[in-house]
Amino acid sequence: LASHAKGWLPASIESSSWLRSSTRRADDLWRKIPGAAETRWFGQDRGRYMDISELAAAIDNSGVRFDYLLFDACFMSSVEALYDLRRAADYIVASPCEVMAHGFPYDTVIPSLFADDGARYDLAAACRNVYEYYNAVDSYKSGCATLTVCDELERLATALHDINAGATKAVVASTLQSYDGMETHQFYDLEEYALALTADDARGQAFVQQMERCFPPEGRFHTAQFFSMYNNRMNDIRYYSGVTTYAPVETYSDDEQQQTYLNEWQQTAWYAATKR
């Protein structure tokens, strides 16, 4: 699936941004920096969007479970979105950050999807193809892709629930790896976030082990940096589990937009499965 995407964020938030697009506030999180290179923010259908939960329901209603889904779209390696899609496919390939406008390099990705004359698919190789293409370009060396094993997502939710149940530390979001260039980040590294919650080594180790089953290391690829059109620069990657999460704080009383995001996040299936 190739499109503009915002991970787990609901269409209602996107629609409101679209409606005010001609008069956006200077502090709108989703405001592209003028003159920034293009990422896959194009092709909108007159401001009409679909929630990932709606996509998952449509696939479920079809009675089809795909072998895999490949998202050539920004921010779709979001654990909240992946969890919604856990019954839609056996595997998912997606990027945790923005995808450059050129998209995935299909001249190399397609052969990986039809390996051995079509007898099998090599999704880890498809992730590697994305990385290798962007790592070799002269500018905007920004290419990240991760493979998800969908049958492991519910056990991952249980592992995070166990961490949340015994969480002893407050997470300082500014210390976490983020995957967007917005002033207030929306997409943080899931593994680093979970480990920041707990001082319990056993729970932390159990979570990391489940992460490796859910997101096999041989299917996690990233360039040294990622580009974001929201700050118009390359951003360092110092920690990469390949999947993002929203990192909540208790309240955003002074920020109506962020409070709305927090409220919406608390309606996700992932939140319901992992809250303490």
Which role does the model predict for each range below?
Residues 2-14, 30-276:
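Terminal, contiguous helix-loop blocks that mediate binding/assembly
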Residues 21-23:
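Glycine-rich, acidic and aromatic/proline-enriched surface loops and short helix-turn segments
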